[in-house]
């Protein structure tokens, strides 16, 4: 005899939770908007305005993810209930097991959609940049910054965010002094925004012939790419623009011509750099985009200073604002804000950050 009631109760709960999400995400309005977007994208002249067409394409993906998932959950619950009935009528254990497995799949989809409620910020759906800066400590700190860069690149690849190296400055002996990476995809900023802060490494340094333990720091600053229609006034007189030859271990992703651009916003001290294109003009445009985005994020932080642990500028992220400790000799990585801890240090350094990120988002950081 099959244990039917637990499965039916689970399906009932899934349906109730799906209905709640239908209201939370305003399903009807999103479905109507999806139809409008599809109609616009079918117009033959839509690509006369490439930026608008790209924005519509991005909006369609976002809408389809919500509308499509709710449709799958709604229809899926009905289908599984029918499978259960067929299994009971035919006393078919294989069909019943299939129904149980399908119910588990639906629950996973539902949990993923419920988690999207964490992304309620104005720019959570945006692409984003991560600035990585090594702390004091010479080669050991610069090697740690490179490890952090690799960690985020791996995370981005695993989640389909197409990480793009915008700027990289080599360390004196090994590692890097700084890097900027762009993450492109839905909710990139929403996922990564709580990673801003200082990451602390404790290990026996491979650069110390005595094998002593060293403590190193690396700061991470995450900020969203903002739309061009958001008004951020930048006075050209406030800018210092430097052109230099690109350097860095970026391989084929970093060019070597004298087209790299560095822009300093003198009033705030904010510095942005770009060296990933052979065109100085394109690098300058990219720098201005980053500068605009960074100044906007800093302004948002300033307005919400009482609620956020972030400082007003990247350079003000002090070594006291540590968010995570990586103690490799003891095989322990701990988030100092949420208490989440793991001993699988290599997996984290290979980009397995979801446990930490999800906990920080759920705690409202």
Curated annotation (Swiss-Prot):
Report the residues modified as N5-methylglutamine: 252
> Which PROSITE patterns does this one have?
RF_PROK_I
The keyword rRNA processing belongs to this UniProt entry's keyword annotation: no
Post-translational modification comment from the UniProt entry: Methylated by PrmC. Methylation increases the termination efficiency of RF2.
Recorded superkingdom = Bacteria
* GO CC annotations on file: cytoplasm
Question: What are the recorded GO MF terms, alphabetically?
Answer: translation release factor activity, codon specific
Q: Where would you say this protein principally sits, based on its record?
A: cytoplasm
Q: Where in the cell is it found?
A: Cytoplasm
Q: Which UniProt keywords apply?
A: Cytoplasm, Methylation, Protein biosynthesis
Show the InterPro entries listed in the entry: PCRF, Pep_chain_release_fac_I, Pep_chain_release_fac_I_sf, PrfB
Q: Which family does it belong to?
A: Belongs to the prokaryotic/mitochondrial release factor family.
So what does this one do? Peptide chain release factor 2 directs the termination of translation in response to the peptide chain termination codons UGA and UAA.
PANTHER family with a match to the protein in the record:
CLASS I PEPTIDE CHAIN RELEASE FACTOR, PEPTIDE CHAIN RELEASE FACTOR 2
Protein name according to UniProt: Peptide chain release factor 2
This protein's species is: Aeromonas salmonicida (strain A449)
Query: Which lineage ranks, top first, belong to the organism behind this chain?
Result: Bacteria, Pseudomonadati, Pseudomonadota, Gammaproteobacteria, Aeromonadales
């Amino acid at each position: 005899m099959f244990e039917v009631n637990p499965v039916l109760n689970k399906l009932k709960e899934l349906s109730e939770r799906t209905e709640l999400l239908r209201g939370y995400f305003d399903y009807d309005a999103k479905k109507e908007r999806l139809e409008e977007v599809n109609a616009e994208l079918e117009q033959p002249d839509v690509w006369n305005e490439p930026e608008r067409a790209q924005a519509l394409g991005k909006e369609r993906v976002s809408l389809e993810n919500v509308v499509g998932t709710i449709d799958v959950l709604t229809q899926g619950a009905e289908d599984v209930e029918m499978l259960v009935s067929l299994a009971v009528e035919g006393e078919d254990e294989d069909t019943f097991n299939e129904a149980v497995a399908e119910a588990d799949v639906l629950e996973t989809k539902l949990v993923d959609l419920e988690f999207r409620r964490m992304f309620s910020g104005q720019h959570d759906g945006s692409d984003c940049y991560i600035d990585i800066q090594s702390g004091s400590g010479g080669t050991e700190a610069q090697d740690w910054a490179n490890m952090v860069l690799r960690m985020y690149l791996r995370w981005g690849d695993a989640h389909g965010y197409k990480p793009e190296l915008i700027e990289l400055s080599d360390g004196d002996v090994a590692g890097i002094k700084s890097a900027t990476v762009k993450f492109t995809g839905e909710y990139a900023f929403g996922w990564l925004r709580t990673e801003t802060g200082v990451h602390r490494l404790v290990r026996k340094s491979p650069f110390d012939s005595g094998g002593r333990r060293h403590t190193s720091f690396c700061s991470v600053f995450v900020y969203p790419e903002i739309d061009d229609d958001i008004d951020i006034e930048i006075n050209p007189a406030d800018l210092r623009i430097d052109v230099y030859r690109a350097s860095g271990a970026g391989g084929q992703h970093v060019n070597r011509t004298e087209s790299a651009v560095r822009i300093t916003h003198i009033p705030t001290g904010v510095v942005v750099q770009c060296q990933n294109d052979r065109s100085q003009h394109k690098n300058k445009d990219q720098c201005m985009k980053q500068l605009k985005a960074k100044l906007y994020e800093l302004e948002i932080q300033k307005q919400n200073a009482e609620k956020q642990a972030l400082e007003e500028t990247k350079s003000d992220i002090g070594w006291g604002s540590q968010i995570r400790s990586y103690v490799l000799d003891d095989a322990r990585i701990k988030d100092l804000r949420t208490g989440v801890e793991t001993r699988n240090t290599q997996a984290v350094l290979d980009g397995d950050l979801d446990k930490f990120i999800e906990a920080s988002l759920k705690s409202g950081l």
